């Protein structure tokens, strides 16, 4: 790498790091960290262990932002000093070291950009992702199961615990619906851009004539609320039905009525949980899902975006799609919002979604 190229890169990095400083408001960040540390030093801090742990997590997250910024800024200053020295006197060994440092700095900046893009109120929370195939029968239901596998692999590769909350088998293959829970910091922040209709074009393995089919499947994503957010749900407003639950792929979880379906009468929202072995456990999980949907609905009303963000896709068809997955006559996955695309469709279906997720977060800033 020539010195002129390194200089241009460092100038661009300096602009980005300066932008980070302005967006972070370092003085305010330092004050917030100091306030949290003061809370943690109080003798009664551990009286409520759950609340204490949340304060610790918040403090650690803010410190990480601050420390990462300082590390990048220090690396930039060191690189700029080395560049000045090399412009005065050539040194191959130092130039090789500077090149490595410049590459490493670029990688740090890219990671930091992603971190600060997760700045929405619920980005840090766990996520519940629901998959609902559209019309199209077995082909659409099989497409739903392919998406379930894709998201599960992505979650596991990124260290999230992935749980099945509810699973309804397809008529012949695939699934009629599934609800997945992603447990880990920033799960909702990473996944929120996946909400929408996903379109598949392929030669259907279920068509003896080997014709090309187009299928649509809806994906919905919502944050899983923690105890700091209270949602009051009146018992009189909720209808509970129980039924025998079956596991993914036809596995029988329990022969008694352990599955729970909750209907919120005022809004018509329906949620269900089937994967716990007890009715009590499924009711708790279904109620948590219902509260998340109701809270999201209320926030959306305040923003006058009920139809878009309620959690129900208006129409599983061409007009509302966010991404196309074309297997035939060529191979291409393209996000219709950001324009990001790749021909590596097998990798995408194996869970390599980072390019799409990162592009959405930047597009949505």
Curated annotation (Swiss-Prot):
GO terms for molecular function: translation release factor activity, codon specific. Keywords: Cytoplasm, Methylation, Protein biosynthesis. Methylated by PrmC. Methylation increases the termination efficiency of RF2. Pfam families: PCRF (PF03462), RF-1 (PF00472). Its main location: cytoplasm. The modification N5-methylglutamine is found at residue 251. GO terms for cellular component: cytoplasm. Gene3D superfamilies: 3.30.160.20, 3.30.70.1660, Release factor. It is found in: Cytoplasm. Peptide chain release factor 2 directs the termination of translation in response to the peptide chain termination codons UGA and UAA. Belongs to the prokaryotic/mitochondrial release factor family. This is Peptide chain release factor 2. It comes from Lactococcus lactis subsp. lactis (strain IL1403) (Streptococcus lactis).
